[in-house]
Amino acid sequence: MIKEFCAENFTKIPQAIQKGANRIELCDNLAVGGTTPSTGVIEEVLAYAGEHSVPVMTIIRPRGGNFVYNDIELKIMHTDLIEAKKLGTDGIVIGCLTEDGWLDEEALDLFIETAEGLQITFHMAFDALSKENQFKAIDWLAERGVTRILTHGGPAGTPIEDNFDHLKELIVYADQRILILPGGGISTENVQTVMDTLKVTEVHGTKIV
């Protein structure tokens, strides 16, 4: 069972690991859904988590808001990805879309190639796709060796329990080609229900431990 703790900077990480978090998604600025953490934060978290054999997934996201990025933002993301890889992150968390509601294939191809050797999570930008495109995106991301997709299974703010049916559809369709990682609204109180209902071995959240 992997409980991925979504952390804003370093502060809560020691306590989370002590309580049983066995993977970290590292962000800054969770008020806007998480943005790229600073070099200093990445370094300190990798050092601490490394001592406890806990892998770290570093989010690469230049700002809050939507997931459609211009050329300068994509360049910033690419530089940040290279830096996080140099620092020794175990994986990266990315997601970028086009204006017309599909994956930004060109940008993602570059990021996936640059991240070779790292785990890759495609984040909740996935939830901004239409349901039809979500299934196509599973194919596209799985073909390129992306490790997992983080998804709430429905609109942000809905109880995750309301989205179990769609999450089950995604899990069945993914068919172990790529891992579906449920997140958003999972806490210590419902984590066992989520795992039992969806038959998943990995879950994600800020209140997961």
Swiss-Prot record:
It is found in: Cytoplasm. Its main location: cytoplasm. InterPro entries: CutC-like, CutC-like_dom_sf. Pfam families: CutC. Disruption phenotype: Mutant shows a significant increase in the intracellular copper concentration after 90 and 135 minutes of exposure to copper. Gene3D superfamilies: Copper homeostasis (CutC) domain (3.20.20.380). It comes from the Bacteria. GO terms for cellular component: cytoplasm. Induction: Induced late during copper exposure. One of its GO terms (molecular function) is copper ion binding. Keywords: Cytoplasm. The keyword Cytoplasm applies. PANTHER family: COPPER HOMEOSTASIS PROTEIN CUTC (PTHR12598), COPPER HOMEOSTASIS PROTEIN CUTC HOMOLOG (PTHR12598:SF0). Might participate in the control of copper homeostasis; data from other bacteria suggests it is not involved. Belongs to the CutC family. This is PF03932 family protein CutC. The gene is cutC.
